[in-house]
């Protein structure tokens, strides 16, 4: 059973084993969260080369010692046996493992998501139908456009002011509930007066 969780990557080192399209997609997910990644493969999709210093590329076949210094390992090769070997080694070494072609061998899966600043909405079908996750993500991207990054930031700033201004928790909760019903322009007006 998988449990939805947001993972703090700040002090974690990540390696992706594989250099194809799926590995690139996984790499881009981590880069989207400001995390540099090491990628190990005997050959790379040319788009990896365009990523510059955000990615450390190791041009080699998988060897067990490569994963020693990493906390998170993504097995994204096109060889099921290699992916299984990586998963087995990661279990022995207590590394978090995601095997892209096997939910059963994975400690975690990476949900489809919509990210707007600090607003993060994860979508998962438990690996049953990724196309549905993609469809839902597309719908959510239209509802929660790029302006929601500013909206969340402004609500966060107002929340801090409300916490200082209202000592009564019930009253504070009611004010915050009312704020989230307002649009960004209304919030900007309120911010001027607090």
Whereabouts are the PLM-identified features?
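Alpha-helix C-terminal capping/helix-to-coil transition sites in glycosyltransferase folds
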Residues: 11, 68-70, 116
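Short loop/edge segments at beta-strand edges and connector loops
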Residues: 41, 58-61, 101
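Residue-level detector of alpha-helix initiation sites
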Residues: 20-22, 81, 127
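Hydrophobic beta-strand scaffold residues
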Residues: 37, 57, 96-97
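An accessory alpha-helical subdomain
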Residues: 127-194
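ADP-ribose/adenylate-binding Rossmann-like module
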Residues: 72-76, 83-109
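Hydrophobic, well-ordered beta-alpha structural blocks that scaffold small-molecule cofactor pockets
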Residues: 1-43, 48-50
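Glycine-rich, highly charged phosphate/nucleotide-binding loops
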Residues: 50-68
């Amino acid at each position: 059973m998988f449990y939805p969780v947001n993972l703090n990557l700040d002090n974690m080192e990540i390696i992706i084993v594989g250099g194809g399209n799926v590995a690139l997609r996984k790499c881009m997910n981590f880069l989207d969260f400001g995390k540099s990644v090491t990628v190990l493969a005997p050959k790379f999709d040319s788009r990896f080369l365009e990523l510059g210093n955000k990615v450390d590329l190791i041009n080699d076949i998988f060897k067990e010692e490569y994963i020693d210094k990493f906390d998170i390992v993504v097995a994204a090769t096109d060889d099921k046996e290699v992916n299984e070997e990586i998963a087995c080694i990661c279990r022995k070494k207590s590394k978090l493992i995601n095997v892209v072609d096997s939910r059963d061998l994975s400690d975690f899966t990476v949900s489809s998501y919509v990210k707007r600043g600090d607003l993060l909405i994860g979508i998962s079908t438990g690996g049953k139908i990724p196309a549905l996750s993609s469809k839902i993500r597309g719908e959510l991207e239209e509802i929660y456009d790029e302006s929601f990054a500013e909206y969340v930031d402004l609500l966060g700033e107002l929340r801090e002011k409300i916490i200082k201004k209202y000592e009564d928790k019930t009253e504070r909760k009611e004010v915050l509930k009312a704020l989230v019903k307002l649009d960004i322009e209304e919030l900007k007006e309120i911010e001027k007066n607090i």
